[in-house]
């Protein structure tokens, strides 16, 4: 079944232009040929995304499409319409994202991605309190033997597929747009004989140790950036290194944002009588929790400003204690007798089920009279 233009752009039919453009840009980046070299499926999706956006970004064409579908567009001659605004927007977008425009105004770009992402493993303690950590990284550096050309003796030939433009023009339905040349990957030049040092990759890998300051309160999947510690995309110029935290869980504390949760096991007699217990604090001292009589299982109590500090502000969350009522697994003879006496001492109050269930039983019996 053919997808609608709305389904292709992953938006609702009532979506406004801002939502449509935002979704288009996200999908165009995801499936762009520069990021999916040799992937035919991604290439087809990229074509469909552009075709869909070419219609939905134009209110007149969108109205025709909503009423008559693709046939209505063709019959109305929409394929001959003015797409200058669309291409202008498309060109500026890809100029920023990939280094070239939609109409062939290309600037030379390195095959090395400036920025890269690395996982940073942290213990619960390191994440909560922050720390200084030495990180081992491996980054891409411009090959000195070929000056990043990937070619032996730096000898490059003009690409015959695109005549050195780095782009080829394609037509999809009533859409016409530029696409990165697959033969030269948008460079306009091709390698005849690969460089022996980098095997034609244009870069070599270098190891480095970096001292990073981990902020107090960083959370799992949070990212921090180390400027100028990424790949060397041009001689002497490096991108940024992004570190994504992977925080190990603690056996006692559970974390949700800046709030900490801890379960406090308490015996059932403590719930009946009320009691004061000690609760651990991140600050190293002990907090007193006064459990009121007849507290409930899973009831929570919050200590404000005893949680985790926000990594980018002075805000600090809460420590939330959840009661976990524990009952004895077995009773000895003396305990059994004591509990039976205690139960009997409550009289009718000790059997609250009777007032509810016996009334219900009587009601049901009346139904069958």
UniProtKB/Swiss-Prot annotation:
Binding-site residues for Zn(2+) 1, renumbered to this chain: 143, 146, 195, 198
Family in the record: Belongs to the DnaJ family.
Positions annotated as CXXCXGXG motif repeat: 143-150, 159-166, 181-188, 195-202
Gene Ontology biological process: chaperone cofactor-dependent protein refolding; DNA replication; protein refolding; response to heat
Zinc finger residue extent: CR-type: 130-207
Annotated cofactor note: Binds 2 Zn(2+) ions per monomer.
Compartment list: Cytoplasm
NCBIfam families given in the database record: DnaJ_bact, PRK10767.1, PRK14288.1
Cysteine disulfide links: none
Protein name: Chaperone protein DnaJ
HAMAP family: DnaJ (MF_01152)
Predominant location: cytoplasm
């Amino acid at each position: 079944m053919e997808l609608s233009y709305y389904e292709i752009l992953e938006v609702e039919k009532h979506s406004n232009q801002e939502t449509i453009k935002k979704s288009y840009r996200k999908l165009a980046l995801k499936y762009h040929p520069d990021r999916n070299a040799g992937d035919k499926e991604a290439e087809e999706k990229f074509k469909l995304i552009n075709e869909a956006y070419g219609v939905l970004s134009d209110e007149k064409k969108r109205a025709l499409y909503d009423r008559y579908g693709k046939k209505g567009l063709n019959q109305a001659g929409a394929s001959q319409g003015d797409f200058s605004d669309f291409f202008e927007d498309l060109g500026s977008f890809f100029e920023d994202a990939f280094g070239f425009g939609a109409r062939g105004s290309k600037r030379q770009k390195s095959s090395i991605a400036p920025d890269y992402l690395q996982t940073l493993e942290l213990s619960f303690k390191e994440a909560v309190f922050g720390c200084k950590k030495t990180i081992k990284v491996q980054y891409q550096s411009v090959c000195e033997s070929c000056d990043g050309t990937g070619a032996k003796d730096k000898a490059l030939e003009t690409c015959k597929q695109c005549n050195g433009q780095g782009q080829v023009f394609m037509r999809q339905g009533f859409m016409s747009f530029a696409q990165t040349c697959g033969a030269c990957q948008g460079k306009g030049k091709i390698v005849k004989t690969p460089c022996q040092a980098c095997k034609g990759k244009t870069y070599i890998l270098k190891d480095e140790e970096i001292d990073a300051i981990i902020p107090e309160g960083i959370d799992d999947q949070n990212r921090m950036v180390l400027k100028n510690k990424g790949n060397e995309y041009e001689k002497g110029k490096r991108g940024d290194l992004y570190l994504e935290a992977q925080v190990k869980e603690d056996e006692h504390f559970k974390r949700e944002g800046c709030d900490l949760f801890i379960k406090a096991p308490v015996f059932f007699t403590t719930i009946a009588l009320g009691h004061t217990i000690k609760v651990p604090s991140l600050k190293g001292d002990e907090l007193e929790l006064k459990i009121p009589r007849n507290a409930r299982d899973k009831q929570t109590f919050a200590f404000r400003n005893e949680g985790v500090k926000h990594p980018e502000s002075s805000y600090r969350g809460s420590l939330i204690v959840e009661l976990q009522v524990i009952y004895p697994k077995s009773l000895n003879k003396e305990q059994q007798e004591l509990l039976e006496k205690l139960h009997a001492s409550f009289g009718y109050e000790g059997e609250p089920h009777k007032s509810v269930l016996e009334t219900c039983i009587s009601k049901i019996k009346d139904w069958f009279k």
